[in-house]
Amino acid sequence: MFPMVTEFMNYGQQTVRAARYIGQGFIITLSHANRLPVTIQYPYEKLITSERFRGRIHFEFDKCIACEVCVRVCPIDLPVVDWKLETDIRKKRLLNYSIDFGICIFCGNCVEYCPTNCLSMTEEYELSTYHRHELNYNQIALGRLPMSIIDDYTIRTILNLPEIKT
């Protein structure tokens, strides 16, 4: 007889515990009900990126001295620098510079360690394409400045997101 009573008590304790867990989940759900939505309508609304956002790399061909510091500090040896030694002036002449953004991890080491500041990070983050080979940018594509989303009248920019209270 006693085993049946203890089983009934265990069943009651499990029921109370399950009801408590469901109630806690319901309270958490209700606390989130009065918050503003965090999502945005992406193609028509875009967030203004922060000042230190690491987007596509911008390259200035005239400033580059082909020192290859960017290649040495890159964790995956990504930038491809082709240069030719000019014997009459004893300097390197840059021929080609390219970065494959399909492989790039956007760590920013190349920008940080560049001695001539010919590399900089932009706020451009829309790099998606249908073919991987289109992500390999040469010096001409890297030299393009991104279009600012603030100047585009078809896109509504969202400056401040609602603060999330934890």
UniProtKB/Swiss-Prot annotation:
One of its GO terms (cellular component) is chloroplast thylakoid membrane. It comes from the Eukaryota. [4Fe-4S] cluster 2 binds at residues 74, 104, 107, 110. Keywords: 4Fe-4S, Chloroplast, Iron, Iron-sulfur, Membrane, Metal-binding, NAD, NADP, Plastid, Plastoquinone, Quinone, Repeat, Thylakoid, Translocase. Belongs to the complex I 23 kDa subunit family. NDH shuttles electrons from NAD(P)H:plastoquinone, via FMN and iron-sulfur (Fe-S) centers, to quinones in the photosynthetic chain and possibly in a chloroplast respiratory chain. The immediate electron acceptor for the enzyme in this species is believed to be plastoquinone. Couples the redox reaction to proton translocation, and thus conserves the redox energy in a proton gradient. This is NAD(P)H-quinone oxidoreductase subunit I, chloroplastic. The lineage of its organism: Eukaryota, Viridiplantae, Streptophyta, Embryophyta, Tracheophyta.
